[in-house]
């Protein structure tokens, strides 16, 4: 049984233990390190391959294994690791040994001394082999696969507890792998040696010494490989002797800069965060040290980087006196003058570099600023005579060696050192045990080491790991017990009847004084967080920082209130001290210096105390002032005394932060641009000092001078070569130079790097091209190859199509090509050509002496072309014309030749002149541009009227007016572009000859055709003559009476013969082949040729047939004559044969023509039928609909109630769809319908009276109807029953069945209030038809649009487009009969449904699916009878504003977006009045008419239900309200953008971002009221003080008048309780009045400030724009940039010419010079600049500010379903009402309450809520994560028990409606919260580490709870 249990039960566990054991893991990782091949493998293999002997093999193997053993030992032994891991050590080992190695190879005889025996180990060469393998094993691993395998052992060391066993086992594993590898190598070598086929080579046999030569060659090859490997390794650090030295900033300069910065910081006011922890100074030190890991410190840290900065002219002495010096601040110490910096402490390398992780610490970064050394070190340096240590000179750690980029800060002069790694390994306590953390703050590690070193005097015994863990467990238990007892005590007090507020734990507050018990205000309390915290101004005045208090008692106790400071202050130094009488000024200066030095405690961490001193000082009663000055220089409270022994103590009012110094580089580097700027500035100021040399590599560029403005001798010096860096006293000779910088268009990977640093090693990036913009790894070459192969395939396909095009039988004439694909191909071709040009230019620029060669070739070709080739061609041409007896063209040709100009240009194409060469053109390059290039023509064209072809040629000629000369004398359109085809001289000659030949051919062809026609006519005449003869012959045969019977018999065949002849004639006309209807494959010329050939064939056949018939006719006539002699039977048989022959011939002809006849006949029938079907019904329908429409229009025009202005539609057009739609929609106006059912006749008072009398309708019946978000078919029946039963209409007049229009009334009403689809009556009355037509041109078809007839669309597309617009307009104006009454019934019915709000049972009927903005929330004011519900005509802008805000969830009811709502260009002078607005309602006076109050501002987005256009009144409008945005919108999910730049863009921008393809981006900026707004801006900028006061008074008077009018208006109100209702308009006017008063107050404040005065309107707008560019960015257009550069190039040429007319006109015609850019107006506004395309504004994508709780939930990983994150209105939240849509959405704590809650309800259902949140979290963590049980940390069974989840489900299944009971819901909430403590998990980091830094949050092993299994949560 035991054996079975061992086999079955424990076999798996035993296997797992063996696998996870340290020995097995070490063997595995050690074996893997074998595959990491290093440089030493070369020597190991060399000893075996070269057959150097057994001793060499043994020594090589021994050295190799010894070196590897040393590497493994260095992993465990830190000193050896530091010795072998430092680059200094490796460099010292490599450089001497390389020389020794090569010397030993060359001088082998020198090393072969001693015994001559081969087996002797005394041979020095064998020892060198051992040493070589030993040393090179210590180097980094070089070859396959990577050094990661060698570092696997180091990585696993952090996870292993038994490290020594792991190192030993890993070495054994490596040894096993090495033995196997060497065995394999030995087998391969022996196989090669034994294989005779390899060794027995003919060459080897013929040469005896070839083997020896081969061995020596292999040795040399291995030496070369070894040398390359070593050099590659040494490339890590550049040679210090070759490296360029950087400019080091002197100490005096840095002090001066620091003092200037300190003065600036004192003068400026800065904000600082007042959150400070008051627990301990150690805690603050840790936090500040942790904050040091940031790479880019904030400006706050930058300004406080050296708090002890004082004026440099100030001198402080310890005795209290103050003297002034000129340069530096000095302190007398032991009779020596030393600088202030020498009193700073400095870390010694020998003291604090013991830890393994020190090499990555921040101490290296601080050493550049810790400039002080000890006195002993300074003396040694002075004796040796070196300014710096030798190691520092050779290996300067302060300079840049790695390829870092210089990050310059505006505040700091020197760059900040941010090269330290983010990983720092150090031991820390975690759960009471020491563990290695790789993100430990290095500054905190340094601080702890200092504290431990100083505390070693106090503590003699260190705690073990077990003691630390037990101590941690006991502390946690004690904390848990204390918290539990406190909670129990509070519960007991609560049970006794105490009040809950007294029992609850209060929030900890910070008090000023213990006696008075007064706490700091919430704004300044550092213990508070959240909304109570604020930011205060920090004043640097001395009065607020310190306070002098004189006291003679209690000074000793107050000295030692900071004991940590006593451990980290400076070392004890001997000071000379002299007592002087008390001096207040010296004391204040001394205290200032001491106070400012306190903030450097984190850096100046050196103690001055010893344990014996502390024991003595505690026993002293009187302090000796001399000892105090020696030891208490930097105490927390600095104490001094006067002669009267009165102690003066400096007391802090607030706690000073412990700051640290930011590590900065000593070297002050400048870029090349800064260097040139400083150089020019010094030249202007005539300073002799040369600027510092630039140390930063800039982009490769060359300065090209394009123009030199000289006042004198300008024409005498055509080739100026002035130097920019020198200035002369004679200003007449030198002038201002205008230069451009030409950058190299190639890859510049060394840009912004520091001179002297090595280049970045890109092992995986290969550059194989001259110009490679996107350098990538060779791994992606396959993708590039695929792209190239695709391109090659496309080119091959095109060539194949060209070759085999003639082989294709049928090719369509029109080939449809994809335009987008064509454009893409053209773009690719342009890009390729551009890349080729750049490659060629950079090749010429990079090759040595290439520019000089190219320039000389260009100049030579230019001279040969201008003065040799072209004149010879002109002479040859004119001589040829004279020989051909034509007029010569000497004058014209030489005139064009003189017009050609060869302009010298710079390398990038900037034109200079014909005679002026650019500076340094042999070095920088040159281009030659040919203007008006001469082209030789055989003859001159006549100056006739230009045709279309002539215009094209003229345009092409203008484009060919310039070119660039290539190296080979060709012409190119662009520099380095492909040579273009020059116009051929002989091409027009050959074309002229070709045209003449074609003319001759055409004439001959015409002659042939005419001859054919003539012959055809002649043959026709011949046939007519033959027929006439036959007729005469037949006539004479009829006259003979004897032959009457025979003739009768013979007559029939003669008739048949005649018919045959006639049929032959008919055949002559019909034998012409009918051309095929498929003529698309033939061109017109081919058709003509084919017809002519057919005609010739037919004529020839007809002639042959006629000749045959002639012969046949004569033969038959003979037979007929001789037939008198024959019998009748013979005649009959002959006649039958003739009949059969004729019948056969006709049948053949009929069969042959039958197919074409049937086809043509059917086509003609189909065509006729189609035309009939189209025309006849169309005409009938047209007449029918026109008659119906006339009747309807007549009935509508008779209606007196329709007084609105509706444009008449065109009566002549055919309205198919609109007429049908109007007929159905206006069916209620039919004559058959009774007048009682026209609801427009019912008055509002009557309907109100009938509704008030009915008791049938109940609101709960409409609850389900209104809660539905979709229009189901059964809704209309429900609404019909509800509103049909109250008998609003008389029973007598009501029919049995309602008409269709009345049944659909409520459905149309619901649809009319849909967000984006207005009803037809609303749409018809908005704006006149002109605007509708203009607007609908940009609209899209929505889901209700209809399609027109396809035939109409094909006939005329423009007419169809105009008809479609009119149809949409007509469809919107269908419900004309209810134009005024429809809205009133909607309002009345909704009022009635929502009346009597006292009953709160059905108060959750809040709204329909229409979502509105925050300012439109339903107030739930039950005392108000008039409410602000959504069915009263809210503007569409509200819906647009909420729907298009970023982050707001879209409404589920919105299915389609109709762009007709967005009316962006409706900016005319219209004062739109709306009937119903936000807080106004319909008012009824005595006469029954309605008065509608007007809105105070225009709203173009507001498309309300009823609008009246009144153009008589014009109201001024503010600039910031030109979009008509609503200023009362309370909630915006994006951010409040109104104070930002251009708030009018916000609403449009949100709409555009949601639908960018529908809305044009131009609509964001277009506005027709430009001039008006510009005037308003200019007026507001220039208003003086008097006008402001007058305007304010006028505005107040105007508001008072409006308020009086509104009060009069309210008097006629018929509402029941008008006094209980607030008037929103009055409140709005009060708000306006308040704003005006605030503006007046603010204007008084602004008077005191110095305001910048702008000279022009443009400056004011641009200044405002640049200040508010946070939302929009400004950039130049790329096209505009090109235009500007081309203009500059033309200007450079024009400035050098005397006659500018011809060149200027030519450049304007070519488009090189843009006149719009030349005529830049000075007073252009920003809007005009945008319109002209000079500036382009692009919106920046707004970032959303996430909720902090939401980030916490996402970080932990449990995402809550949050469909809508909009908070409920505050006033609604208090009463507990919410939107009904929120029932299916997530609930966030303290944001939304689904139920009512009492203000006195303290949520005490959970007892732990008595404690504060911080103490509560602490208690939960201590209980859940039991510190005494380790298994509880790894997995808590309580939270992983499935039974708990089931119990949760059972609990929820008890009642599905938990929201109805507040207590049940609170129970549920607090039941779920302990199981899902998300906040507790997130706060664990803060609790355990006692810090707010969350950088190590991801390092915690958080065990997540299972997800809750209920779907609705």
Swiss-Prot record:
Signal peptide residues are: none
Question: What family, per the record?
Answer: Belongs to the TIC214 family.
Q: Where is the composition biased (Basic and acidic residues)?
A: 260-289, 315-330
Q: Does the keyword Endoplasmic reticulum apply?
A: no
- Can you list the disulfide-bonded cysteine pairs? none
Tell me which GO cellular component terms the UniProt record holds.
chloroplast inner membrane
Provide the membrane topology annotation. Multi-pass membrane protein
Which species does the entry assign this protein to? Acorus calamus (Sweet flag)
Instruction: Write the protein's name.
Output: Protein TIC 214
Q: Where in the cell is it found?
A: Plastid, Chloroplast inner membrane
């Amino acid at each position: 049984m035991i054996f079975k249990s061992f086999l079955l039960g424990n076999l798996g566990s035993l296997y797992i233990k063996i696998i996870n054991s340290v020995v097995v893991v070490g063997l595995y990782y050690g074996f893997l390190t074998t595959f990491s091949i290093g440089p030493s493998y070369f020597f190991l293999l060399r000893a075996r391959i070269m057959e150097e002997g057994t001793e060499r093999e043994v020594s090589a193997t021994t050295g190799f294994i010894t070196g590897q053993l040393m590497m493994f030992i260095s992993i465990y032994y830190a000193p050896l690791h530091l010795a072998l891991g430092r680059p200094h050590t490796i460099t010292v080992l490599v450089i001497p040994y390389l020389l020794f190695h090569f010397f030993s190879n060359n001088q082998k005889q020198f090393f072969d001394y001693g015994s001559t025996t081969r087996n002797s180990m005394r041979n020095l060469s064998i020892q060198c082999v051992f040493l070589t393998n030993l040393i090179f094993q210590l180097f980094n691993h070089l070859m396959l696969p990577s050094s990661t395998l060698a570092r696997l052992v180091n990585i696993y060391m952090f996870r292993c507890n038994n490290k020594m066993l792991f190192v030993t086992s890993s070495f054994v594993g490596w040894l096993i792998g090495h033995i196997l590898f060497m065995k394999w190598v030995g087998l391969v070598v022996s196989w090669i040696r034994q294989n005779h086929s390899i060794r027995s080579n003919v060459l080897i046999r013929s040469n005896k010494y070839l083997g020896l030569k081969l061995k020596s060659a292999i040795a040399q090859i291995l030496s070369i490989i070894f040398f390359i490997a070593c050099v590659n390794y040494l490339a890590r650090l550049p040679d210090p002797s070759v490296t360029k030295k950087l400019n080091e900033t002197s100490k005096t300069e840095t002090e001066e800069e620091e003092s200037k910065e300190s003065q600036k910081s004192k003068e400026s006011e800065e904000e600082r965060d007042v959150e400070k922890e008051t627990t301990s100074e150690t805690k603050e030190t840790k936090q500040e040290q942790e904050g040091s890991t940031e790479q880019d410190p904030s400006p706050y840290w930058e300004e406080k980087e050296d708090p002890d900065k004082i004026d440099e002219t100030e001198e402080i002495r310890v005795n209290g006196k103050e003297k002034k010096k000129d340069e530096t601040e000095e302190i007398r110490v032991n009779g020596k003058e030393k600088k202030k910096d020498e009193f700073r402490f400095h870390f010694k390398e020998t003291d604090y570099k013991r830890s393994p992780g020190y090499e990555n610490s921040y101490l290296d970064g601080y050493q550049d600023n810790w400039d002080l050394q000890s006195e002993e070190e300074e003396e040694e340096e002075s004796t040796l005579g070196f300014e710096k240590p030798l190691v520092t000179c050779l290996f300067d750690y302060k300079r840049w060696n790695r390829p870092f980029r210089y990050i310059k800060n505006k505040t700091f002069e020197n760059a900040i050192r941010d090269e330290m790694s983010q990983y720092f390994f150090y031991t820390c306590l975690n759960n009471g045990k020491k563990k290695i953390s790789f993100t430990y703050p290095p500054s905190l590690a340094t601080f702890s080491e200092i504290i431990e070193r100083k505390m070693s005097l106090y503590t003699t015994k260190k705690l073990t790991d077990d003691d630390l863990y037990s101590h941690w467990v006991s502390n946690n238990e004690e904390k848990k017990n204390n918290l539990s007892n406190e909670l129990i005590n509070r519960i007991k007090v609560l049970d006794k009847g105490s009040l809950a507020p007294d029992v609850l734990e209060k929030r900890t507050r910070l008090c000023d004084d213990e006696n008075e018990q007064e706490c700091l205000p919430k704004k300044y309390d550092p213990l508070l967080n959240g909304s109570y915290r604020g930011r205060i101004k920090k004043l640097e005045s001395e009065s607020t920082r310190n306070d002098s208090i004189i006291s003679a008692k209690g000074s000793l106790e107050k000295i030692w209130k900071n004991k940590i400071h006593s451990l980290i202050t400076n070392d004890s130094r001997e000071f000379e001290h002299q007592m002087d009488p008390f001096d207040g000024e010296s004391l204040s200066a001394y205290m200032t210096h001491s106070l400012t030095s306190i903030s450097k405690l984190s850096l100046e961490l050196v103690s001055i105390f010893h344990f014996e001193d502390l024991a003595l000082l505690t026993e002293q009663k009187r302090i000796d002032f001399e000892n105090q000055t020696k030891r208490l220089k930097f105490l927390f409270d600095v104490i001094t005394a006067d002669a009267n022994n009165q102690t003066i103590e400096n007391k802090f009012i607030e706690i000073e932060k412990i700051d640290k110094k930011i590590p900065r580089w000593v070297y002050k580097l400048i870029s090349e641009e800064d260097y040139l700027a400083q150089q020019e500035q010094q030249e202007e100021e005539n300073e002799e000092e040369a600027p510092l040399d630039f140390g930063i590599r800039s982009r490769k560029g060359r300065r090209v001078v394009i123009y030199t403005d000289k006042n004198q001798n300008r024409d005498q010096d055509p080739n100026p070569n002035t130097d920019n860096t020198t200035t002369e006293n004679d200003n007449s000779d030198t002038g201002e130079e205008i230069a451009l910088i030409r950058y190299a268009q190639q890859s510049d990977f060394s840009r912004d790097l520091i001179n002297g640093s090595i280049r970045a090693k890109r092992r995986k990036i290969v550059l194989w091209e001259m110009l490679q913009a996107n350098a990538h790894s060779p791994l992606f070459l396959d993708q590039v190859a695929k792209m190239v192969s695709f391109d090659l395939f496309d080119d091959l396909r095109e060539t194949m199509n060209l070759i085999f095009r003639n082989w294709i039988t049928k090719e369509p004439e029109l080939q449809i090509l994809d335009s987008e694909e064509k454009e893409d191909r053209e773009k690719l071709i342009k890009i390729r050509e551009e890349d080729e040009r750049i490659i060629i230019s950079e090749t010429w620029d990079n090759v040595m002496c290439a520019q000089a060669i190219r320039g000389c070739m260009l100049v030579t070709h230019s001279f040969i072309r201008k003065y040799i080739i072209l004149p010879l061609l002109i002479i040859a041409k004119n001589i040829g014309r004279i020989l051909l007896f034509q007029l010569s063209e000497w004058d014209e040709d030489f005139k064009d030749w003189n017009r050609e100009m060869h302009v010298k240009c710079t390398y990038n194409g900037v034109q200079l002149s014909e005679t002026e060469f650019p500076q340094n053109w042999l070095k920088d390059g040159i281009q030659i541009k040919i203007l008006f290039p001469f082209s030789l023509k055989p003859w001159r064209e006549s100056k006739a009227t230009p045709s279309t072809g002539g215009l094209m040629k003229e345009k092409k000629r203008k484009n060919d007016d310039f070119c660039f000369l290539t190296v080979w004398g060709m012409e190119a359109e662009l520099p380095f572009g492909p040579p273009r085809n020059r116009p051929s001289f002989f091409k027009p000659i050959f074309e002229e000859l070709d045209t003449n030949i074609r003319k001759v051919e055409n004439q001959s062809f015409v002659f042939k055709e005419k001859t054919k026609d003539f012959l055809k006519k002649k043959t026709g005449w011949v046939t007519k003559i033959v027929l006439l003869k036959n007729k005469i012959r037949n006539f004479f045969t009829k006259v003979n009476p004897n032959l009457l019977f025979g003739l009768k018999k013979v007559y029939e065949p003669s008739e048949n013969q005649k018919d045959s002849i006639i049929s032959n004639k008919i055949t002559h006309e019909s034998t012409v082949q009918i051309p095929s209807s498929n003529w698309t494959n033939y061109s017109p010329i081919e058709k003509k040729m084919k017809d002519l050939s057919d005609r010739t064939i037919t004529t020839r056949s007809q002639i042959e047939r006629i000749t045959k018939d002639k012969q046949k006719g004569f033969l038959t006539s003979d037979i007929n004559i001789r037939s008198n002699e024959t019998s009748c039977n013979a005649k009959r048989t002959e006649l039958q044969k003739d009949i059969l022959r004729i019948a056969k011939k006709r049948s053949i002809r009929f069969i042959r023509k039958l197919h074409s006849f049937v086809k043509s006949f059917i086509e003609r029938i189909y065509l006729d039928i189609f035309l009939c079907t189209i025309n006849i019904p169309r005409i009938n329908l047209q007449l029918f609909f026109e008659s119906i429409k006339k009747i309807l229009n007549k009935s509508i025009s008779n209606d007196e109630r329709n007084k609105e202005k509706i444009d008449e539609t065109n009566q002549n057009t055919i309205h198919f769809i609109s007429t049908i739609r109007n007929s159905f929609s206006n069916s209620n106006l039919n004559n058959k319908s009774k007048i009682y059912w026209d609801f427009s006749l019912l008055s509002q008072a009557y309907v109100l009276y009938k509704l008030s009398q009915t008791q049938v309708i109940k609101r709960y019946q409409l609850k389900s109807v209104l809660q539905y978000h979709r229009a189901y078919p059964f809704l209309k029946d429900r609404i019909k029953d509800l509103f049909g039963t109250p008998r609003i209409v008389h029973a007598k007049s009501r029919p049995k069945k309602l008409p269709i229009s009345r049944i659909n009334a409520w459905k149309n009403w619901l649809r009319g209030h849909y967000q984006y689809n207005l009803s037809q009556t609303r749409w018809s009355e908005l704006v006149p038809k002109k605007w509708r037509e203009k607007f609908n041109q940009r609209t899209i078809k929505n889901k209700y649009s209809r399609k027109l007839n396809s035939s109409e669309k094909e006939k005329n597309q423009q007419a169809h487009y105009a008809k479609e617009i009119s149809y949409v307009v007509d469809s919107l104006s269908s419900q004309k009969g209810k134009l005024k009454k429809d809205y009133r019934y909607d309002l009345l019915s909704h009022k009635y449904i929502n009346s009597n709000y006292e009953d709160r049972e059905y108060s959750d009927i809040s709204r329909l699916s229409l979502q509105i903005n925050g300012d439109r929330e339903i107030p739930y004011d039950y005392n108000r009878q008039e409410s602000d519900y959504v069915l009263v005509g809210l503007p569409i802008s509200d819906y647009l504003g909420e729907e298009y805000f970023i982050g707001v969830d879209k409404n589920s009811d919105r299915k389609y977006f109709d762009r007709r709502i967005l009316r962006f260009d409706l900016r005319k002078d219209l004062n739109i009045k709306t009937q119903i607005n936000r807080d106004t309602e319909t008012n009824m006076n005595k006469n029954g008419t309605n008065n509608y109050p007007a809105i105070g501002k225009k709203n173009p987005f507001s498309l309300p239900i009823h609008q009246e256009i009144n153009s008589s009144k014009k109201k001024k409008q503010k600039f910031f309200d030109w979009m008509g945005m609503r200023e009362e919108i309370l909630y915006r999910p994006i951010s409040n953008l109104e104070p930002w730049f251009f708030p009018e863009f916000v609403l449009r921008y949100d709409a555009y971002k949601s639908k960018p393809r529908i809305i044009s981006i131009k609509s964001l900026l277009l506005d027709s009221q430009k001039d008006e707004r510009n005037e308003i801006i200019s007026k507001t900028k220039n208003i003086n003080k008097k006008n402001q006061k007058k305007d304010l008074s006028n505005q107040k008077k105007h508001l008072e008048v409006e308020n009086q009018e509104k009060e009069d208006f309210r008097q006629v109100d018929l509402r029941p309780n008008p006094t209980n209702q607030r008037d929103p308009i009055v409140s709005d006017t009060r708000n306006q009045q308040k704003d005006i008063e605030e503006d007046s107050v603010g204007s008084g404040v602004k008077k005191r400030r110095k305001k910048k005065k702008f000279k022009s309107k443009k400056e004011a707008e641009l200044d405002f724009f640049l200040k508010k560019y946070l939302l929009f960015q400004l950039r130049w257009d790329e096209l505009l940039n090109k235009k500007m550069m081309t203009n500059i190039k033309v200007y450079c040429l024009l400035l050098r010419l005397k006659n500018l007319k011809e060149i200027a006109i030519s450049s304007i015609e070519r488009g090189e010079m843009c006149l719009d850019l030349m005529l830049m107006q000075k007073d252009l506004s920003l809007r005009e600049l945008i319109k002209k395309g000079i500036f382009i504004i692009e919106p920046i994508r707004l970032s959303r500010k996430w909720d902090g709780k939401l980030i916490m939930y996402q970080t932990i990983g449990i995402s809550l379903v949050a469909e809508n994150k909009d908070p409920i209105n505050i006033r609604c939240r208090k009463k507990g009402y919410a939107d009904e849509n929120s029932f299916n959405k997530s609930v966030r704590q303290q944001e939304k309450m689904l139920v009512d809650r009492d203000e006195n309800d303290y949520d005490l259902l959970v007892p732990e809520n008595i404690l504060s949140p911080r103490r509560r979290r602490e208690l939960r963590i201590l209980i859940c994560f039991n510190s005494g049980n380790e298994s509880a940390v790894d997995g808590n069974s309580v939270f992983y028990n499935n039974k708990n989840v089931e119990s949760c489900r059972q609990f929820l299944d008890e009642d599905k409606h938990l929201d109805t009971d507040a207590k049940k819901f609170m129970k549920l909430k607090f039941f779920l919260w302990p199981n899902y403590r998300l906040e507790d998990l997130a706060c664990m980091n803060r609790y355990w580490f006692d810090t707010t830094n969350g950088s190590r949050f991801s390092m915690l092993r958080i065990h997540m709870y299972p997800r809750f299994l209920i779907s609705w949560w």
